[in-house]
Amino acid sequence: MPKKRDIEFLYELGSLRNIQRGWRQHFGMDVANDLEHTVRVVWLAMLIARMEGVKNEEKIIKMALVHDMAETRVSDHSYVQKVYVQADEHSAANDLFAGTSFEDLNTDTLKEYEERQCIEAKIVKDADNLDVDLEMRELEQKGSKLPSKWMENRALVRNEKLYTESAKKLWDSLNEVDVDSWHMETNKWNRIPDAGK
């Protein structure tokens, strides 16, 4: 029989869909919620790991899954809010994972991610940063002017905050690929003659 705390954890995990990203305030339009952000961070981290030749995808996936879990209790704060709000993410994570079958993810995986000493932690942090850039491109496609105002700041992140060369190459490539090409160019008449057969 599963532990009660495990079931509670699953419900709390589901609440990530209700946690809006802190920077939504600045864009004035819908942005990905924490759960949506986490899914893309997992895939970005695996892509960076493969580009870097890092083989421990299990560790990377676990880190990516837990990297923002404390936000179920402390929310996600924007760069402006962080000046005034001191969220105790450590205590939130301790309480979140306490009594669950996933306690080791807090004591080991999350701690290792936050220390940023191993390559897997650096890859996940790079993925966390790159998801912001992907979403800004998507918002720009929807008509937001704010992403262009943030380009200088995001270039600084690229040059000074990204750890891996692969993440920097991905960042450089973001503007080269149209946000809509994945669906506009992928159909049985254009690129994949056998699609749908």
Residue spans of the language-model regions?
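Alpha-helical, largely C-terminal catalytic domains
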Residues: 1-197
